Structure formats: C-alpha cells, structure tokens
Amino acid sequence: MNTIIEEYLNFIQIEKGLSNNTIGAYRRDLKKYKDYLEDNKISHIDFIDRQIIQECLGHLIDMGQSSKSLARFISTIRSFHQFALREKYAAKDPTVLIETPKYEKKLPDVLEIDEVIALLETPDLTKNNGYRDRTMLELLYATGMRVTEIIQLDVEDVNLMMGFVRVFGKGNKERIVPLGDTVIEYLTTYIETVRPQLLKQTTTQALFLNMHGKSLSRQGIWKIIKQYGLKANINKTLTPHTLRHSFATHLLENGADLRAVQEMLGHSDISTTQLYTHVSKSQIRKMYTQFHPRA
C-alpha cells in the first residue's frame, strides 16, 4: 500500500499540479485510511471492499470527524482507488457505490465596511512593518486573495502601471485581478521605499517580507491579522479568509456581476461564489427601510 500511495501522491502533484497544502491534506487522509486498514489486518489493496470502507467511515464518525472532513476523506480515497485501478495496481474500485455525505457550507464572519476601515487604519505607518502590514491588508481586501496566494506573490507579479496583480491560485492556475487607486498608492510606496529596507542582505523576490528579509509565512500573516483585529476591537473571528469573504460580499451587495466575482476569486465552480450572495443584516434593514411602505 505504501508504494501505491506514494505513486498516487506523485501523480497528483505532477499531473494535476496541486499545491503543497492540498497534497498534505491528501497525504493525511490516506494515512488515516492506511492506519485503519493495517489495524484491521488488511494487507493488500484487492482485499478492500465496500463494507470495509463503510466500517472505516463509521470509525471516523465515532472519532468525531465532521461531515465536511468525511466528504473530503471519501473524495481522497475514491480518487486513490480510481488511480490504482487505472494503473493496474488493483483489480477493482471498491468506492464505486460509496456515497459522499452532504454538508452545509458555512461562511465565516463578514466584516462591515466600518470594521474593514478600522482594521485597515490600525497599523502604524511610521514603522516599516506597520506600512507593510497596511499594504498587505489593503491588498487582501482589494483583491480577495487567499493567504497562500499572497505569500507566493513576487514583486514582478504586481503591475502598478497597468493596475493589476497576477495571482497563481489552486492548481497553479493564473488569474489577473484589478487593483484600485488606494492599494496602488500603498503598493508603490511599499515597493519603492519600505521593502528595500526590509530586504536587508537577501535577494528574494517575494513581495511581503518579514523583519529578517525573508518571505512572510502563512502563520505570520494569520498572527498579524489577528493582532490588528484585537487592536481594532473587532469582536469577530478574524482570519485572512475573513477579508476574502468580505471582499466578495461587499462587491455583490453593491451590484457586482457574479461571474466577474467568480473570476477574481479564482473559483472553478460558480456555486462556490454563490455562497456570497447571502445578504448581510445591515443590508436587509436598509432594503426594508427603503422599500417597505410601512417602514
């Protein structure tokens, strides 16, 4: 099994171009699967049948797996068994009749406009790291980028003259996202004045640098955003994805085209973007007051 799993992981990394984070999730799912099979003395892939998989799923449910995690686990092992059958490592695919559980997709908190402004205005612009943080927050809210996308950004991916940023999303898919005047202004000063001071002796092309001149990490960005959220007295769960959700929600609330928002977010399936068509409480109150004859 170990050999087949490694062959499969190599396949999805090379052939499908999946990110390291996605590969890591697949690897963790397959480790759970392999551990369960070994604990139950299943030594060969062709000994696995539908009943064994269902018992494995029952075990994961007993261990407290959420329906979302379970759905991803099933997707992983289904893809794995399809690969094994196609490459003749196995004589059958035992996942054929296994159903994927449905789960409710929940959005994290979305910031109101005044909360976004409070967050953006929190960094100290007199300090290099403060100016960097303001620029990064402006860019996250202006583009709806994922945290993994922003740490992969190089200086050359930002075209200030034409007003766009080139983003490499899931599966290394490239997309172009426009930039507004405000974020262009911050990016210009950051790239020309602040970043060279953060760069020190390093030669990295990464856009956002830590105080040692190296690329900001995923954990570093999460920590920065959480810290400013506390300073701005925002009583909501605040992550880089909160700004992404706020970006999409505010665009759609103000009449943006769903397809255009899908393109900017880098969603392959428009149903994912449609999650943002929920209307905020303040927007509901505004519409009620504006349109109800007895409001």
From Swiss-Prot:
PROSITE patterns: CB, TYR_RECOMBINASE. InterPro entries: CB, DNA_brk_join_enz, Integrase-like_cat_sf, Integrase_catalytic, Integrase_recombinase_N, Integrase_SAM-like_N, Recomb_XerD, Tyrosine_recombinase_XerC/XerD. CDD domains: INT_XerDC_C (cd00798). GO terms for biological process: cell division; chromosome segregation; DNA transposition. Transmembrane segments: none annotated. It comes from the Bacteria. Pfam families: Phage_int_SAM_1 (PF02899), Phage_integrase (PF00589). Residues 1-85 form the Core-binding (CB) domain. GO terms for cellular component: cytoplasm. Residues 106-289 form the Tyr recombinase domain. Keywords: Cell cycle, Cell division, Chromosome partition, Cytoplasm, DNA integration, DNA recombination, DNA-binding. It is found in: Cytoplasm. The active site is at R146, K170, H241, R244, H267, Y276 (o-(3'-phospho-dna)-tyrosine intermediate). GO terms for molecular function: DNA binding; tyrosine-based site-specific recombinase activity. PANTHER family: PHAGE INTEGRASE-RELATED, TYROSINE RECOMBINASE XERC. Forms a cyclic heterotetrameric complex composed of two molecules of XerC and two molecules of XerD. Site-specific tyrosine recombinase, which acts by catalyzing the cutting and rejoining of the recombining DNA molecules. The XerC-XerD complex is essential to convert dimers of the bacterial chromosome into monomers to permit their segregation at cell division. It also contributes to the segregational stability of plasmids. Belongs to the 'phage' integrase family. XerD subfamily. This is Tyrosine recombinase XerD. It comes from Staphylococcus epidermidis (strain ATCC 35984 / DSM 28319 / BCRC 17069 / CCUG 31568 / BM 3577 / RP62A). The lineage of its organism: Bacteria, Bacillati, Bacillota, Bacilli, Bacillales.
